[in-house]
Amino acid sequence: MRKWFRVWMVIALFPAAVFSGDRGDAVVTDERGYFVCSVARSASGVWYTAQHCLTGDKLFVNGRNTPYAHLKGDIIQIGKDARQPDKGVMTADRVRAGMRVKVRIGGLSALTDKPTYIEVETKILAVYSSADLKYQLDAPDDAGWYALIHLGAFGGCSGSGVYYRGRLIGVVSAGIAGEYTFVALIPPAR
């Protein structure tokens, strides 16, 4: 019973967030401007999303072709074609199982046709490298790091931010079994 509580809370609270939520947030779109995925913003103002949200090899933000830097795994940094330093994030090497995190989970409102986000608190159940995970979330030559959280995912929430004490640790990457979600973690700078 308790395991479904979080899933139902997201479903129940989402309509309320439509009318009270953010209206000016950026979103990942296709080349025609149609919504594809959510984006996450670090405390220092840098934007991130999931790599699988790209249209081909291009990133469209609010309908405009936008440069990006591919990080390791299923995560990209938006705005420049090379990785920029970002003090508003916590990298994968510092993320641990048991941390309580906030997920700013988002999607597109069918009522307002605007991005809508709600915050849900959850716990990191485990942290994996791609090799340990043995689940296809990235290419073998592009191995990243992932956290497993107890929160259901839905279409369009990929790219939503996951935060620990106000610092971005990664973005929603994949939902499994309607109850758990993999978070693509921000890799340490090289």
Set out the residue ranges of the language-model regions.
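Bacterial N-terminal signal peptides
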Residues: 8-16
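Extracytoplasmic
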Residues: 23, 34-36, 71-75, 117-119, ...
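Extracellular/periplasmic catalytic domains that process cell-envelope and extracellular macromolecules
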Residues: 41-42, 70-71, 94-96, 141, ...
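Active-site-proximal beta-strands of protease catalytic cores
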Residues: 45-51, 97-110, 145-152, 156-180
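Gly/Ser-enriched beta-turn/beta-hairpin loop segments
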Residues: 72, 128-146
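Active-site substrate-binding loop(s) of clan PA
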Residues: 79-128
